């Protein structure tokens, strides 16, 4: 890609898709309370389901958390992800991911069902047309 070709460092935020790549599907308090995350990810829930299932499968195979698998994959693509942590276990998962090596076959397994999403969140809302609109992060 462009970043690799031009030696541009990339540091993505929301590395775990607001927690969706850190646990199997199901009820969470955040899922019911975080309107912003739902707005970003609910429309792609069906297409993302197979990836989440594959992350869970590899986590079981490696005997690690889904967080570790997700971040280990991301670390093969970027300089450093921005990882939010509200609990010690979140930090532990991020640290452990640094030492987890996924095989090329495992990386392919995670990527083969991916379908690109339309731009969403802050980047999609940060346009000249919406510069004066009150956004969720301005509350």
PLM regions with names:
Residues 69:
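Glycine/threonine-rich phosphate-binding loop and adjacent beta-strand/alpha-helix elements that clamp
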Residues 1-33, 65:
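Aromatic-lined glycan-binding groove of carbohydrate-active enzymes
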Residues 72-73:
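Hydrophobic, secondary-structure "cap" segments at the distal end of domains
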Residues 8, 79-80:
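A structural micro-motif
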Residues 5, 29-57, 61, 76, ...:
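Terminal-tail/helix-coil boundary detector
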């Amino acid at each position: 890609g462009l970043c690799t070709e031009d030696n541009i460092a990339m540091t993505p935020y929301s590395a775990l898709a607001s927690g969706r790549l850190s646990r199997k599907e199901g009820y969470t308090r955040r899922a019911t309370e975080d309107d912003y995350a739902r707005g970003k990810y609910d429309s792609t829930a069906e297409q993302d389901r197979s990836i989440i299932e594959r992350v869970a499968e590899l986590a079981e195979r490696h005997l690690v958390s889904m967080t570790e698998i997700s971040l280990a994959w991301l670390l093969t693509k970027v300089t450093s992800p921005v990882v939010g942590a509200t609990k010690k276990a979140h930090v532990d998962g991020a640290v452990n991911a640094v030492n987890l090596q996924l095989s090329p076959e495992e990386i392919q397994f995670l990527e083969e069902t991916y379908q690109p999403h339309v731009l969403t969140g802050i980047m999609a809302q940060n346009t000249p047309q919406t510069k004066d609109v009150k956004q969720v992060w301005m509350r």
